[in-house]
Amino acid sequence: MMKEHSLVVLDRDSTHEKLSRGDIGTIVHIYDGGKGYEVEFVDGSGHTVALITLDAADVRPIGPDELLHVRRTA
């Protein structure tokens, strides 16, 4: 199970207009022992772009061999 404040990768495309598969967020709350997560996604200025509840299957931990990437949101 992932822990609060862990960085996670969105592992599917989202219905949220500004999120895409591969975006990185932070777990801010854990539901039902890890069955779901509240995840915050922020922009480069630290402003919240989305705060959404996701199933455990929708996110995964960042792998040690993965490189972070930047993209425009609008």
Regions of interest found by a model, annotated:
Residues M2-D65, V70:
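Basic/aromatic-rich interaction segments and small domains that mediate binding to polyanionic partners
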